[in-house]
Amino acid sequence: MKLGILSDTHNNIDVVRRALDLLRDSGVSHVVHAGDITSPKMLSLFTGFTARFVLGNGDIDSEALNEESRRLGFGPIGESCVFEEEGKSIIVFHGNNVPMFREAVASGKYHYVIKGHTHLFENYTAGTSRVINPGALYGADEFTVAILDTETGKVERILVEAE
């Protein structure tokens, strides 16, 4: 399965629309957002995807985000999200909680550790986990998202045009 990975969208609606179009065109139907959504109105852009979200340090109104996420059928948004795809365990969190990151990697429980926060693309192995940061769609020199193929383990960095 191809899993689309986004983070740090910071309410940049036009760029997020372009990113989601690119993911859709690449055959992605499942996405995760690693935090800093910032506005509940962003969530409606993800309609048509199976989507999971986590809160970032910029998601000040977590109550409104959760209310909208539930209304749209995505479910609750917490500090982290753990799930499994094709036998691979995945944890998603924003990345500003460094002890949580270290614990996730040190535990050896996760095939994939997905985070955001730094606005920089990352794809590396730490212990037994692959760490993926898709970059950002706001506040970065280049706007990027990622696609993880859970069957092959391939991670693709996708550049999203600003305009």
Go through the PLM ranges and name each one.
Residues M1-L45, F49, N66-F74, G78, ...:
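N-terminal active-site segment of His-dependent metallophosphoesterases
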Residues L6-S7, H30-D36, R52-N57, V92-H94, ...:
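Active-site neighborhood of phospho(di)ester-bond hydrolases with catalytic His/Asp-centered motifs
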Residues H10-V15, T38-K41, D59-A64, N97-R102, ...:
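Active-site environment of divalent metal-dependent phosphoester hydrolases
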Residues N11-D25, V92-S107:
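Pre-active-site segment of Zn-dependent metallo-hydrolases
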Residues D25, I77-E86, G108-K109, T125-G127, ...:
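Binuclear metal-dependent phosphoesterase catalytic core
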Residues F49-A51, T128-S129:
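A short helix->loop->beta-strand "cap" motif at the edges of active sites that frequently abuts
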Residues R52-G95:
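Helix-adjacent hinge/juxtasegments
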Residues R71, Y110-Y112:
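Structural recognition of alpha->loop->beta junctions
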